[in-house]
């Protein structure tokens, strides 16, 4: 069900469609919307999904923000991050999709800076600097790093802001807590893979966009403050299950050509290492369930791989340059 507010110039295509999925993070939503209301660049719409049938967001919320072009959709079931964002992305009219967590708060010039970046780099998608909302002197993440082993992480996570990367550069991908995608690119690659439900789905999207010929640009001046883990604890059974079930699927679907066959043994070893270590961290059962579920999905993953690689535009060399090859990086990964 949709609750829409009539706005002036509703037929005008907005520059940005901002997609916000709410799942147990409604306490942060006013701060998120207040930050959007304060944006210096105003050409955007907001599509908000109240996910999971909790009706945590009152219908009156729309009336509390008369200056925002805001649409509220409700889902009776928890669709997960992937399917939930795909649902509201289909309603979007903007030229660019902004994926924004409900617990992420943009600085007032964030959209203005991103607008300038889209004009200068129209074929790119964009990563922005995330700082910890409760410790703004620390970095929550700058961009996604993808290692040759198949592991992935946020660059500079938990490092002091004084060590932040201050130059714009092409990177592997963007953390979808505050990321920007050309709508045509998002649609061209099919949006998020809904089989993922949550965790690793934005890294999978990064990879597919890169393979399709859409590079990612890190824009350090665009700063957002991110609470993080507002909807699920980072080491919860839910997070461990989905993250480790989805880990091999990303690798199998996306790693191109010769790189796949050269790196697959290392990826297998990484998965076996997690199975061995998990019992010592109290996660043995959930890790075993995750890897078994991943194995059961390998057939579908290879079918998707065939379709993705058939349409690949980026060369194997292009992708190789985006990967992290440092053998020690997974051990001290935050700075790599």
PLM regions with names:
Residues 105-147, 151:
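Conserved donor NDP-sugar-binding/catalytic core segment of glycosyltransferases
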Residues 44-52, 71-75:
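Short beta-strand/loop segment that forms part of the nucleotide-sugar
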Residues 97:
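Short aromatic/hydrophobic "clamp" motif used to bind/position activated sugar donors
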Residues 75-92, 102:
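Glycine-rich, basic loop-to-helix element that forms the pyrophosphate-binding segment
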Residues 34-43:
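Short, acidic, metal-binding catalytic loop of nucleotide-sugar glycosyltransferases
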Residues 172-223:
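A short, conserved alpha-helix in the catalytic core of glycosyltransferases
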Residues 139, 148, 159-184, 203-205, ...:
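A recurrent flexible, glycine/aromatic-enriched loop bordering the glycosyltransferase active site
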Residues 212, 216-306, 317-322, 326-329:
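Active-site-adjacent helix/loop segment of glycosyltransferases
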């Amino acid at each position: 069900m949709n609750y829409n507010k009539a706005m002036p110039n509703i037929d005008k295509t907005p520059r940005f469609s901002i997609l916000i999925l709410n799942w147990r993070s409604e306490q942060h939503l006013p701060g998120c919307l207040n930050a959007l209301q304060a944006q210096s660049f105003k050409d955007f719409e907001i599509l908000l999904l109240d996910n999971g049938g909790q009706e945590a967001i009152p219908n009156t919320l729309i009336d509390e923000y008369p200056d925002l072009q805001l649409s509220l959709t409700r889902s009776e079931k928890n669709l997960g991050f992937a399917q939930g964002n795909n649902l509201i992305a289909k309603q979007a009219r903007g030229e660019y999709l902004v994926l924004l967590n409900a617990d992420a708060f943009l600085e007032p010039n964030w959209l203005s800076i991103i607008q300038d970046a889209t004009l200068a780099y129209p074929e790119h998608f964009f990563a922005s600097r995330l700082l910890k909302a409760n410790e703004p002197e620390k970095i929550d993440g700058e961009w996604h790093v993808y290692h040759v082993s198949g592991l992935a992480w946020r660059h500079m996570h938990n490092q002091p802001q004084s060590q932040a990367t201050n130059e714009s550069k092409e990177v592997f991908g963007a953390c979808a807590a505050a990321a920007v995608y050309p709508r045509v690119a998002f649609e061209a690659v099919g949006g998020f893979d809904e089989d993922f439900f949550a965790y690793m789905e934005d890294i999978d999207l990064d990879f597919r966009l890169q393979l399709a010929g859409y590079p990612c640009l890190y824009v350090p001046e665009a700063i957002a403050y991110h609470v993080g883990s507002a909807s699920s604890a980072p080491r919860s059974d839910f997070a461990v299950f989905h993250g480790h079930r989805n880990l091999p699927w990303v690798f199998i679907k996306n790693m191109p050509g010769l790189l796949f066959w050269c790196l697959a043994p290392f990826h297998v070893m990484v998965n076996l290492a997690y199975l061995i270590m998990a019992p010592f961290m109290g996660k043995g059962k959930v890790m075993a369930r995750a890897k078994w579920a991943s194995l059961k999905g390998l057939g579908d993953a290879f079918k998707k791989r065939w379709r993705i690689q058939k349409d690949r535009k980026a060369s194997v060399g292009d992708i190789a340059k985006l990967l992290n090859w440092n053998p020690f990086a997974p051990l001290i990964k935050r700075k790599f």
